[in-house]
């Protein structure tokens, strides 16, 4: 199998076959992100011969996998024709596959027409994961995400119309000190107009190699406290009114939260309120450092510097 650098996938894709079709990120400019700094290039498309060889190799061992996940930061940036070709390759080796997932940026959806998206859905593209992070335009601009909340609304409604389901990544702590609750409410207002199947929340972790760390050093941005991050997460849950699943499965999270909304809302809020009322900032900081220290490829958090 051809894999380049660290391979990232959502926790809920644990049972999908991971096939590399791209490596790196076309944007690669978010101030907080260090995920692809181990690569000597910004973005690369895998040769189709390699993709085909990987599918052939995997099919010798796993013949009945229903879902394929294309790796890379945003394979959905590829043209519709390339995505169709990749789906046909999957069909050749996995004739009974059901769906294909991948990461996508909002900007990857923009150039694709509704008819193109419907074609992709017919070939199995479904359950794509989008790193929205927040619905707060101020934070989207500061973190250099490359899109605004109105773009999220327009493009995800296009996915809805095409029948392609999607999941959102939400980044707790992205707003900075004193803005957590305001940002969470703005995000809930955006998400409530859409239909994410899963909202996967991760807590912002700041590495010394990130551009965001340099902003902190210059005094341009201040991190939320750990307790404020928990309050922010509670605020998001309180203000969501859609049918969705919210989870905090990633290693960066201080606590694990899993539930279906609106059915589990009261239970989740009660759990978060308990954690907040019993939280000690120093202990939470220590916990975050201990969680992070297992990633030996990264410098320690700036708090240890």
Locate predicted features:
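Conserved SAM/AdoMet-binding glycine-rich loop
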Residues: 59-165
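A short acidic, helix-capping loop that chelates divalent metal ions and anchors anionic groups
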Residues: 41, 136-142, 211, 255-257
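Auxiliary Fe-S-binding modules of radical SAM enzymes
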Residues: 1-13, 192-305
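Conserved strand-turn element in the central/C-terminal portion of the radical SAM core barrel
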Residues: 107, 135-139, 159-183, 202-208, ...
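Conserved, mostly hydrophobic/aromatic
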Residues: 25, 33, 51, 70, ...
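Canonical Radical SAM [4Fe-4S] cluster-binding loop centered on the CxxxCxxC motif
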Residues: 4-50
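Hydrophobic faces of well-ordered beta-strands that scaffold small-molecule active sites
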Residues: 17-19, 68, 98-104, 128-130, ...
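Catalytic cores of alpha/beta
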Residues: 115-117, 176-193
């Amino acid at each position: 199998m051809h894999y380049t650098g660290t391979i990232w996938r959502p926790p809920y894709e644990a049972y999908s076959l991971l096939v590399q079709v791209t490596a790196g990120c076309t944007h690669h400019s978010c101030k907080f992100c260090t995920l692809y700094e181990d690569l000597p290039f910004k973005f690369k498309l895998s040769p189709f011969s390699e993709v085909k060889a990987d599918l052939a190799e995997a099919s010798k061992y796993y013949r009945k996998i229903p879902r394929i996940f294309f790796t890379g930061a945003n394979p959905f940036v590829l043209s519709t024709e390339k995505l169709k070709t990749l789906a046909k390759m999957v069909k050749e080796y996995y004739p009974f596959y059901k769906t294909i997932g991948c990461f996508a940026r909002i900007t990857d959806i923009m150039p694709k027409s509704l008819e193109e998206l419907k074609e992709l859905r017919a070939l199995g593209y479904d359950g794509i994961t989008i790193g929205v992070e927040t619905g707060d335009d101020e934070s989207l601009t500061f973190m250099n995400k490359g899109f605004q909340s109105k773009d999220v609304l327009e493009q995800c409604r296009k996915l809805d119309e095409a029948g392609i389901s999607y999941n959102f990544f939400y980044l707790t702590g992205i707003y900075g000190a004193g803005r957590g609750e305001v940002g969470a409410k703005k995000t809930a207002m955006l998400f409530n107009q859409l239909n994410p199947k899963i909202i996967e929340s991760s807590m912002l972790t700041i590495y010394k190699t990130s551009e965001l760390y340099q902003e902190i050093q210059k005094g341009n941005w201040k991190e939320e406290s750990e307790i404020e991050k928990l309050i922010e997460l509670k605020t998001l849950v309180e203000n969501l009114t859609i049918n969705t699943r919210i989870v905090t499965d990633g290693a960066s999270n201080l606590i694990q939260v899993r539930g279906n909304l609106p059915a589990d809302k009261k239970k989740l809020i009660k759990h978060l309120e308990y954690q907040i009322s019993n939280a000690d900032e120093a202990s939470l900081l220590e916990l975050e450092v201990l969680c992070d220290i297992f990633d030996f490829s990264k410098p320690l958090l700036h708090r240890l510097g």
